[in-house]
């Protein structure tokens, strides 16, 4: 039996993950474990969410058949709802305007039972309430003939265990250190009780020797704690460097389709997830170990003194667990609401800050300000609910602790009065109980944070499980030009409309090939396919008669120079934007800049271009982009709208560059609307 059992409960990581979570839930229902990240990819979930077609195609790859049905719910009564075939994915239109998917697993006379990815829990509600948000679109699920229960994707538990296995030596040292700290704390408590009894019984003893013993214990405790702090800091740094290094190394080798389905904010948040996981592996596990050892030791000590004292300590555990369960159940839903509110607020701020000039032109400042304020108020109102629950939980825990402390004082005092317990034992009981309370609170804090840590591990494992671009393959001959050929190429982004449908053309060395067509017809997509940024759905893309799928990605992209539109510049100097890690002299950099007509008298190579090149005009940015391509001396040139930001002089300069590159025997492919380039082209292909 597999250690990692399948489940039907999945909570979405982001606001667009409800569709993939429903696929994971269905797979779990049929006994197959699937990761959310994998479900996102096979369903072509993008930044706007998942389409019904994407859900159907993704389910097909899992061996599940989904039959889409649309119906008018105004004619449905309770009997028709009860006849709904389950399981089924149901589309909801929420009152806040968001589109949502849930999985219905059962119906009865009382209502419908469904799994909601918003909180990852099962819910039951009446048919009347459910139909108020249901759009009438159902995806009826059934197992296909090729269904297999072989797990697909990486689960968060497996990913966390792999991390723990990588750092098991450090974790073991932390456990030993926690055990020693607990032992010294208990030794201090027992010694306090012994000293109290000796003082109360004899009234005369060598206090200085006892003081030295206490000082020794405190010194040893300080040493262990200081070592623990330093050790945790060292391990935290190593885990940070290791995880961030692995994430960066993996992230920039992923296919372009991955970045189509995820926002920049989501990628940045994965780096924050590294910090959460690091805290769990270092401080969390060692804190859990120290707390666990202390709880066990306290229960043993108190039971050895008195059964009521032991039962008092044990009784706190279910009380704390109940509080923890209640808070976790609320926070699970609250986290999703915060995620939705934060996503809406962040997207609004990003959009309106980027459009600030247009907002001023339209005199819409007040409207935008009110819109952003409402989004922020919704976010704060949602976060306020979670904050209040947490504070009430802490207050409840403190109250329970106070009651338990009073109980221990009363019971200990009663035992002292009847001569069953000494004053020293009471001191021991109070001291270890104080340790017990702080340890239980620490363990509860770990338990409360566990769902967030698990989600962070799941989100990070989703990225780490994405297959990288193929790095091996045939190496193209350096310095040689190759023909580029498309044979009946078809391509679509995700499961959307076809961008290219049976497109064919051939570009030859020593020739300029011009590709024209209206906006959105697939001209820029053609350039990305040549670079093997995406895989064609069908057809062949050949470089020198070799399929781009068989060519080494590094070799392919070194052979091809690509000038994109608009120019993509880093927030760095002009020199760094042209070199991009390569070793060229300043003289060579200046030479290619002069070829493009860049005015070196106005700008130095050390000038920072700003974020996205905002310190430069569009024409200047385009010249730097062309210079960056030329300095690498590629044998195949692909230029996307090279004259878009150029004036008459700039266009003439670019046309001269194209002639020179053609005359030197290179393969030149130009994508443009500019009619002036028609006279320059040797072959013209129109995309329709």
Feature roles, as predicted:
Residues 249-250, 254-266, 337-387, 457:
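Loop segments that connect adjacent transmembrane helices in multi-pass transporters
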Residues 567-608:
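Conserved "ABC signature" C-loop
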Residues 637-641:
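Catalytic Walker B motif of ABC-type/P-loop ATPase nucleotide-binding domains
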Residues 341, 361-364, 388, 435-463:
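Cytosolic ends of transmembrane helices, especially the final helix of ABC transmembrane type-1 domains
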Residues 1-188, 201-210, 228, 232, ...:
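Membrane-integrated ABC transporters
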Residues 178, 210-221, 225, 287-337, ...:
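Transmembrane helices of ABC transporter permease
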Residues 531:
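Helix-to-loop junction immediately C-terminal to a conserved catalytic motif
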